[in-house]
């Protein structure tokens, strides 16, 4: 086999392959021999059918398989020799093997762009210090205290007010007919917390315990359920009870009951530690992104179309899932598939640029990701999605997604590696506006 490489672009290669007659005939002979071992034909023992009969009877299948097997062998040899890893599906352009004839075909595929990494060792970057204000801790304790409050019926007969909890029944009607799915009994509503529509809450605030009333409720135009968006209905409400919160004392007993802390001081320390850890991670990620954005401006390389397309698809799929959680579909955005692609394309291109840069840095820093680390990431994905780990892993392997997952882990490690070599200055947080 001989081949000639043509660089179609900085990220796409085309390989013209020529296969001599001897290799063609050998490939066909091997395929026929494989068929002979398993084929069953009347009048012949298994494995004893003459090769010529097998070839004539199963010519279409044999020649197709021989062509595919031979091309696959060549592809492995070519990409190994070129020391490249195809990013995209390898496109094959050619016919089928013919006995006694030379065979020519072409393959094309995309590869990572080649570029020189900028010098990132000692790169100046600022990272904001993690700071936790005592007022923030007080707010957390106040929320915990409020959540653990005892609900006590109010002594006087009055409508509910902000801060109260109202127990009620409600049902929606349109043209005098009940609307299916918009009703509940003994529903607990915390007033003043924007848990419900403003019209509904205003109506509830006019009804004392033991009484009922009705009024018009208008759903906003962007309501999650498109069937009700912008619609006005009649809501009938019966209030069973109005309750107020009796807050517990802020003491060691509250800390013990809230989370098994030995004291309120220990509880406050835990809140501070949790806030500090999350903010340190957030500020580090922000500084890393700032550093990466600056480094990306120092290089220029072409983007593989297949890689950008993959991220476009991922972003649109994320958008679809988010819309479904809101009870809506992508079509509710009023955009064509082409418009959606145009909308997410800049972000997809930026993700691709970042990924390519970090994978190149990962090679320079000799970053490695073990199979155990990949499995660990899959375990987390399985737990979040409620899927079986083995089923999920098999899906990732069969669809080639395992390599994308591995590359993401390499990119994450590479970011940490180059950030560790940066000149990081810790700065005070900017004053709140």
Curated annotation (Swiss-Prot):
SUPFAM superfamilies: FKBP-like, Triger factor/SurA peptide-binding domain-like, Trigger factor ribosome-binding domain. InterPro entries: PPIase_dom_sf, Trig_fac, Trigger_fac_C, Trigger_fac_C_sf, Trigger_fac_ribosome-bd_bac, Trigger_fac_ribosome-bd_sf, Trigger_fact/SurA_dom_sf. Pfam families: Trigger_C, Trigger_N. It comes from the Bacteria. It is an enzyme of class 5 (isomerase). It is found in: Cytoplasm. Residues 163-248 form the PPIase FKBP-type domain. Signal peptide: none annotated. GO terms for biological process: 'de novo' cotranslational protein folding; cell division; chaperone-mediated protein folding; protein transport; protein unfolding. Its main location: cytoplasm. One of its GO terms (molecular function) is ribosome binding. Gene3D superfamilies: 3.10.50.40, Trigger factor ribosome-binding domain, Trigger factor, C-terminal domain. Its EC number is 5.2.1.8. Belongs to the FKBP-type PPIase family. Tig subfamily. Involved in protein export. Acts as a chaperone by maintaining the newly synthesized protein in an open conformation. Functions as a peptidyl-prolyl cis-trans isomerase. This is Trigger factor. It comes from Nitratidesulfovibrio vulgaris (strain DP4) (Desulfovibrio vulgaris).
């Amino acid at each position: 086999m001989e081949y000639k490489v043509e660089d179609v672009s900085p990220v796409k290669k085309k390989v013209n392959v020529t296969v001599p007659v001897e290799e063609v005939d050998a490939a066909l002979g091997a395929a026929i021999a494989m068929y002979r071992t398993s084929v069953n034909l009347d009048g012949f023992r298994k494995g004893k059918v003459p090769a010529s009969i097998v070839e004539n009877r199963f010519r279409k299948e044999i020649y197709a398989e021989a062509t595919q097997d031979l091309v696959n062998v060549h592809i492995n040899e070519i990409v190994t020799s070129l020391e490249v890893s195809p990013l995209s599906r390898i496109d094959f352009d050619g016919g089928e093997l013919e006995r006694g004839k030379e065979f020519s075909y072409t393959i094309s595929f995309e590869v990572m762009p080649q570029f020189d990494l900028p010098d990132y060792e000692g790169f100046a970057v600022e990272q904001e210090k993690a700071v936790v204000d005592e007022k923030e801790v007080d707010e957390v304790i106040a929320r915990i205290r409020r959540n653990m409050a005892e609900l006590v019926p109010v002594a006087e007969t009055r409508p509910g007010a902000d801060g109260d909890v109202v127990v009620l029944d409600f049902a929606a009607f349109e043209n005098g007919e009940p609307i299916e799915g918009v009703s509940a009994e003994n529903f607990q509503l915390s007033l003043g917390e924007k848990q419900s529509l403003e019209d509904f809450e205003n109506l509830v605030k006019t009804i004392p315990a033991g009484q009922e009333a009705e009024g018009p409720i208008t759903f906003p135009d962007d309501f999650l359920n498109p069937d009700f968006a912008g619609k006005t209905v009649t809501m009938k409400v019966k209030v069973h009870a109005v309750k107020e919160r009796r807050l517990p004392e802020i003491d060691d007993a509250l800390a013990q009951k809230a989370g098994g802390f030995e004291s309120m001081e220990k509880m406050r320390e835990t809140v501070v530690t949790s806030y500090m850890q999350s903010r340190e991670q957030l500020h580090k990620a922000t500084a890393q992104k700032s550093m990466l954005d600056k480094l990306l401006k120092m290089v220029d390389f072409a983007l593989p179309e297949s890689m950008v397309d993959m991220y476009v698809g991922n972003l649109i799929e994320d958008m679809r899932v988010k819309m479904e959680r809101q009870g809506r579909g992508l079509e509710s955005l009023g955009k064509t598939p082409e418009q959606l692609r145009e909308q997410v394309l800049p972000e997809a291109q930026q993700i691709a640029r970042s990924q390519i840069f970090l994978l190149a840095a990962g090679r320079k820093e000799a970053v490695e990701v073990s199979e155990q680390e990949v499995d660990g990431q899959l375990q987390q994905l399985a737990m979040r999605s409620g899927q079986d780990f083995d089923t999920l892993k098999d899906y990732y392997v069969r669809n080639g997604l395992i390599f994308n997952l591995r590359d993401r882990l390499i990119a994450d490690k590479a970011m940490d590696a180059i950030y560790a070599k940066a000149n990081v200055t810790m700065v005070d947080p900017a004053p709140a506006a």
